[in-house]
Amino acid sequence: MFILGLTGGIGSGKSAVSDYLGKQGITVVDADIIAHRLTSDGSPLLITLKKALGDWVLDHHGRYDRAAVRARVFSDAQTLDQLNAIIHPAIHQAILDELDCSRSAYTILSVPLLFEGRHKSPNLLALCDHVLVVDASNEIQRQRVAKRDGHNPTQIQAIIDQQISREQRLDLAQKIGADILVNDKTLDELHQTLDILHQKYLAMAAQHGLK
């Protein structure tokens, strides 16, 4: 199996990339989607989170309150560590299960914090045979997130600050030989670039299968 790691800052356009390649028949294993599924209403993981952290992790409907949790962990490192200790192993196992089920020519593993977790356990970067980094300027990131999520500038900056800087991400990408896709043009132009990259990854996957 050839695994293509997909990462990038918030608002860079990772979903646009994975959605398009998914339409080409490529399996996409998305860590964010898995995390949402695992914390859905009444899930075992949500029950565990409530017991470990308290009722504040739920909204008044009994659903996982992502906004409240996000606000809390920004200023509370201990709670963040507790949260990660519960969620990350479950997400990692679900990722491994989905990867094992993939039968497409190559498989995309989409992880927003792929580089940030490289020195932690589990290290999802170690699963990847190659990496595609989606890049956009900080200003474009802010504009896209504000339009998509309705966050104010302070909230957006807080999210960006949880990630490594754009400069660090690009430096790491170059060091490991990752592809860097600058996503600052139209959707049609993005798709044209992805058509080229898709053929490249098909060839890389075929070569990988011969080893």
Regions found by a protein language model. Give the residues of each.
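Short, structured coil segments at secondary-structure junctions
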Residues: 24, 53, 126-128, 174-176
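Residue-level signal for inorganic ion chemistry
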Residues: 32, 83, 108, 156, ...
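Well-ordered beta-strand positions
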Residues: 27, 33, 130, 177-179
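An amphipathic alpha-helix signature
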Residues: 46, 50, 138-146, 153, ...
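Small-molecule kinase domains that catalyze NTP-dependent phosphoryl transfer to phosphate-bearing small molecules
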Residues: 95, 103, 120-122, 147-211
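Walker A (P-loop) phosphate-binding motif
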Residues: 1-33
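ATP-dependent NMP and nucleoside kinases share a basic, alpha-helical "lid"
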Residues: 93-100, 109-144
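ATP-dependent small-molecule kinase phosphotransfer cores
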Residues: 33-106
